[in-house]
Structure formats: C-alpha cells, structure tokens
Design a protein with these regions (language model features):
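N-terminal accessory segment detector
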Residues: 1-134, 141-162
C-alpha cells in the first residue's frame, strides 16, 4: 500500500508527518526574503493585504487577515455561532483565553509543527487582538536568532539555554 491508498488519515502527527513534512530544501535553509515572499503570497491568495517592512534581524509582514481576519472582523463566532472558539490558553492559542479555532493554524503550522520535527519555526505569529487589528508574521533572517520568549511561549526550552 502506498501513501495515497490509505483509507483515512490519522490526526496523530506521527502519521501526518509522512504526508505533510517538507522535504528539500528545509525551510530554514531558504533565504529570509524567499520565506517572507512565500508567506505574503499565501496571505494575498486568501484576500489579505500585506505590508512588508524590514529591520536588521527580520522581515515584518503586517496584514489585514484574509479568511481568518474576516472571521474576526465580521464576528461570525459571536453573531451566528458558526465557528468554534478555543478557550484553553497555551501554545496553540498564543496563550490567549479565547482564539477563533481557524486562527490556531497560525500557531500550529509555522511554529509548533516545525519544532516537533526538530526544525525551527518558519515564522513567528502575532494574531489580531480585536476587529480591525492586523496580524503580524515575523520572518527572522537568521532562524537561530529568534528571541527566547518565542520558545518559552511555545512551551519549549530556548536553544540558548540548552
């Protein structure tokens, strides 16, 4: 049986890793401007508008959220009860008491999943706090230079401490 013949996928990361883990080249080996450009394209493809700034250590992508931003701005979680809200502060909710479930993919995919694979986070996310706020992606030029606070928020030991 090959990987496409499986009747159902497991939600266990060990099983999903076979299907979704990136291969070559590793994301952290790509130049930061290429990594930032890939994220910008995804945001624009989801109908977001993105502003890019740069400092010595990182690219800062500030965007009006596309799909998830509209969920926050239009309030379907409150108005129609159509979407779940995660209410367990921790790494996948950015330590918040409430986060629309849709927004959790921004902690899982670029932050938690790479760490589980022994890699570095692809970008550091700061989701919108309230309607109208932008979401932020920090794309570090040197992936080993991420602040210790990032690793602590993700429930990990910072590399500088290890």
């Amino acid at each position: 049986m090959n990987r496409f013949d499986r009747p159902t996928a497991s939600w266990d990361y060990g099983e999903r890793e076979h299907h979704h883990r990136p291969s070559d080249p590793p994301w952290e080996d790509l130049p930061a401007d290429i990594r930032a450009r890939a994220i910008v394209r995804a945001m624009v493809a989801n109908f977001g508008e993105c502003e890019v700034t740069e400092d010595d250590g990182k690219f800062v992508l500030s965007f009006r959220g596309g799909s998830g931003g509209r969920l926050i701005d239009e309030g379907p979680t409150r108005a129609r009860g159509a979407y779940l809200t995660l209410r367990d502060p921790g790494p996948r909710t950015f330590d918040r008491n409430a986060l629309p479930v849709y927004c959790a993919h921004c902690s899982v995919n670029p932050e938690l999943q790479p760490l589980e694979w022994g890699c570095t986070p692809t970008s550091i996310e700061v989701p919108a706090e309230k309607p109208g706020d932008p979401c932020i992606h920090d794309v570090y030029k040197d992936v080993t230079a991420m602040p210790d606070e990032v690793y602590l928020r993700l429930g990990r030991t910072p590399p500088s401490s290890g």
